[in-house]
Amino acid sequence: MNRFFYTVGLIFLFSFFILYSPKTSDLSNNVDLHQQLLISLQKEEERCDLFSGYWVQDLRGSQYTNVSCSSIPESKNCFMQGRPDAGFSQWRWKPDGCELPRFDPGTFFEIVRGKTMAFIGDSVARNHVESLLCLLSSEEMPLGIYKDTEDRTRTWYFPHSNFTLMVIWTRFLVLDEERVINGSVTGVFDLHLDKMDKNWANKLPEIDYAILSDAHWFFRKNYLYEKGKNIGCIFCGEPGIKSLDIDSALQMVIKVVLNYINNCKKCRNILTVLRTFSPAHFADGAWDTGGSCNRTHPLGEKEIDLASLDWKIRSIQVEEIKRVRPVARRRKKFEVLDVTKAMLMRPDGHPNSYWGNKWMKGYNDCVHWCMPGPIDAWNDFLIALLRRHAFTDFTWS
């Protein structure tokens, strides 16, 4: 720990020296030394597994409130919706053996200056972006420059930092077609593994950071196809069709998506970050049978189930990132944002009944996350990953 802070201090010292040194002839040597220090810090961070740890109480609370951040959606604004307890927002993630620094918007903007970042996924990916927007708004307010008719895909621009932030809606990452019977939608989907969802695939060449997530839409009947041929289904139990587990079907999808990105010839220097599964915490029923999540404190590590389907899904996501890394093509990098263990411990962080459910009375939200709340730690993780890669970008071209 002392060595970590010593290295950080040296970095700031030499950054100042480089900027204000009166001897331009020494600039090259100073930059080389600064680069070495940055790499030293990177190695220091890499010795620590940020995603293995526990939650510790932090009475400072969140870096924003539902008053200071005006962009919190009503469905995640648990305090505005009447949630009486505030303790769930007063915890921080503590990795084993090191510290996870709080999110710093200034550092974030320096890393992403002139870049485009896209969060590609479902409504939980949107939840992640909403947390990031609140954290960034203390430094710079964005301009909303695009919104589709359903407000699912959006783009914001931060002019001072020349940074573009996008959230791109997709259910499965690959092309999906909902089955229609007698003119009515069924909630059953055909997934085509050899075709990407164009909502994000068409935008990929303009993206520098792609934050992917997937899984929640797999918990239903879905049919998988490859080159027009059915290769299996989830929850169908039909004769003549191969039955697939959720995790194995998801692994097929993640594999083809990562391969697609790796083979993208028009893409920039792209860092792809796969965010692992964000678990739901319905107790005493499912989402449509009265299930709820009314805890007010985190769980300990010994209280979570690492043999659960949630963990299996997380494991195949990590496995696929490990598979693609050794074969990553030039200008492609792959990382994992491993939030599953941390979030398995946070059944207290969901809106539950405090989500303003005017149209769905009696249904609780134990999938998304209150804001502020434990989801803010995802951005602590994210900036740590970005910082690691920024330190190696001197030679990444």
Swiss-Prot record:
A GO CC term assigned to this protein in UniProt: Golgi membrane
Topological region Cytoplasmic: 1-3
Gene Ontology terms for molecular function: O-acetyltransferase activity; xylan O-acetyltransferase activity
Residues forming the catalytic site: S123 (nucleophile), D365 (proton donor), H368 (proton acceptor)
TM region(s), chain numbering: 4-24
Top EC group: transferase
GO biological process, one term: xylan acetylation
Residue span of motif DXXH motif: 365-368
GDS motif, short sequence motif: residues: 121-123
Regions of this protein lying in the Lumenal compartment: 25-397
Topology with respect to the bilayer: Single-pass type II membrane protein
Glycosylation positions in this chain: N66, N162, N182, N294
Keywords: Disulfide bond, Glycoprotein, Golgi apparatus, Membrane, Signal-anchor, Transferase, Transmembrane, Transmembrane helix
Compartment(s) where it occurs, according to its Swiss-Prot or TrEMBL record: Golgi apparatus membrane
Repeat among keywords: no
A Pfam match: PC-Esterase
Primary role: Xyloglucan acetyltransferase that catalyzes the acetylation of fucosylated Gal residues on xyloglucan side chains. Predominantly catalyze 6-O-monoacetylation of Gal residues in the Fuc-Gal-Xyl trisaccharide side chains of xyloglucan oligomers.
Name of protein: Xyloglucan O-acetyltransferase 3
The species this protein was found in: Populus trichocarpa
Lineage, highest ranks first: Eukaryota, Viridiplantae, Streptophyta, Embryophyta, Tracheophyta
